[in-house]
Amino acid sequence: MIVTTTSGIQGKEIIDYIDIVNGEAIMGANIVRDLFASVRDVVGGRAGSYESKLKEARDIAMDEMKELAKQKGANAIVGIDVDYEVVRDGMLMVAVSGTAVRI
């Protein structure tokens, strides 16, 4: 499945705009506290363990969005947006959304 942040796909014609699709992932209540604990883990200015948690959450949300698009008969998603939010009790939410299309 093609997934892009742009409104179209170069060299492809969108033949049907199907629906808005989304996916969310919420990571454990200790993620913010763990961020500060992982300061020891900083190498070259990057917090490796925190980045891996962000990637894991983003991958889960993206997979959920792709599966929903597939169920609706789409073979691509355009205009995707990825948002990161710290919600109550220090939980991290990653939300992705886009438009499911058929090319």
Curated annotation (Swiss-Prot):
- HAMAP family named among the record's database cross-references: UPF0145
Q: Which NCBIfam families match?
A: PRK12855.1, PRK12856.1
The record, for Pfam families, names:
YbjQ_1
Under the heading InterPro entries, the entry gives: UPF0145_dom_sf, UPF0145_YbjQ-like
Q: Which domain of life is it from?
A: Bacteria
Q: Which family does it belong to?
A: Belongs to the UPF0145 family.
Q: What is the lineage of its organism?
A: Bacteria, Bacillati, Bacillota, Bacilli, Bacillales
The protein's name in its UniProt record: UPF0145 protein BT9727_3206
Signal sequence annotation: none
Instruction: Report the Gene3D superfamilies cross-referenced here.
Output: Hypothetical protein apc22750. Chain B
